Amino acid sequence: MNNLKNLRGTVDLLPDQLIKWQNVEKIVLEQLARASIKEIRTPILEMTELFIRGIGEGTDVVSKEMYTFLDRGERSCTLRPEGTASVARALIQNGISSNPFQKLWYMGPMFRYERPQAGRQRQFHQLGVEFIGYESVRSDVEIIALAWDILGKLGIKELNLEINSLGDIDDRLNFQKSFLKWLEKNKDSLDLDSQNRINKNPLRILDSKNMQTKKALENAPILFNFLSEKSHKRYSDLKKQLNVLQIPYVENFNLVRGLDYYTHTAFEITSCALGSQATVCGGGRYDNLIKQMGGPNTPAIGFAIGLERLILLAGKDLEVPRNTDIYIINQGLIAESLAMDLSRKLRNYDLLVELDLSGASFSKQFKKANKLKSKSIIVIGDDEAANKEFIIRLFDHSGNANKEEVISFENDIKLEKWLKINLLSK
């Protein structure tokens, strides 16, 4: 029988790799908590109709990339390809009108059938932040600043913020009329994929990565030139407030987001730290999505960060594990029982305590403690068990023992004093 393997585009995250993941997630969640943003959790599996209505039938995500199947009840179900539509559905279903202003975050696996590459898998993990009910430019600026600060806190270098305005629905309709005329005249200059989009989702052509099409688009109408005075004012205010916060940005009038629901502010944060420019974070305003999905008219803005790419870019220092505080070496029936009881007591001090369960010789257990670079060890053998005491030994940064003490199992005061001086105060 052939060995079973994971599916292409999925990855096993092993303990050593997860050290960096957990450190990154810890920093991210601390930043979100400081900004008073609350978590929301939605199902991984949703009705397919949610994404058709929410993301847009003509998008690549819906037409090419979704994992969709019929369940036993003949219902069309889809593994979520992104989080915003699910959050919108959850808010509508659970009564958004009772709490119209919310700042929410989510984190979890998403699924898209794409070509796997570094930092992008078919099952990938995404952090999303959504500000629901907020219409002011200040909310746009705050969410951009939050994304910028999270990436900076993680030590990601060479960050670039690109911004654009997609205007409101009327602006886009006016642009689309002019753009469609241009597309019909210049159809032969476009790649086949873009030609197929002309009657389905013409705005997505602006985001084409095909060099032939990108060259042709240099002479196409620009959406920014069709913005109303009101939309221009909003965009100008956005730039002014980013300048006040000293967040550098580049205007990119060709920047459109890959999903249909965006309006007004669109932004991406990229980094060249991996050698070529890679998008780390993307977001924008989606004032029409919740109404489009059957809810009340509700403005909103959000962003998403792919965690796989974030892990690749985050600082090397986040790969360093926290060393074990105490490694308990034990041998003998009574000693093993005492060691287990002591390990539970020590963990109440918020220490990393590893109890050796191998039953190996003392020398092998000492080697394991040394390999883990444990800050200290406790030794309990037959003699210590008979005397109802244990040896605790502290190591310096070079791994040399520099303090040793014998403590009775019943002397909690002495144990706590030793821990405070040698481990808890570090």
From Swiss-Prot:
SUPFAM superfamilies: Class II aaRS ABD-related (SSF52954), Class II aaRS and biotin synthetases (SSF55681)
Matching PROSITE patterns: AA_TRNA_LIGASE_II
Enzyme class: ligase
GO molecular function: ATP binding; histidine-tRNA ligase activity
Cited Pfam families: HGTP_anticodon, tRNA-synt_His
Keywords (A to Z) from UniProt: Aminoacyl-tRNA synthetase, ATP-binding, Cytoplasm, Ligase, Nucleotide-binding, Protein biosynthesis
Main location: cytoplasm
Listed EC numbers: 6.1.1.21
Gene Ontology terms describing biological process: histidyl-tRNA aminoacylation
Substrates-to-products reaction catalysed: tRNA(His) + L-histidine + ATP = L-histidyl-tRNA(His) + AMP + diphosphate + H(+)
Matching InterPro entries: aa-tRNA-synth_II, aa-tRNA-synth_II/BPL/LPL, Anticodon-bd, Anticodon-bd_dom_sf, His-tRNA-ligase, HisRS-like_core, HisRS/HisZ
Annotated PANTHER family: HISTIDINE--TRNA LIGASE, MITOCHONDRIAL-RELATED (PTHR43707:SF1), HISTIDYL-TRNA SYNTHETASE (PTHR43707)
Protein name from the UniProt record: Histidine--tRNA ligase
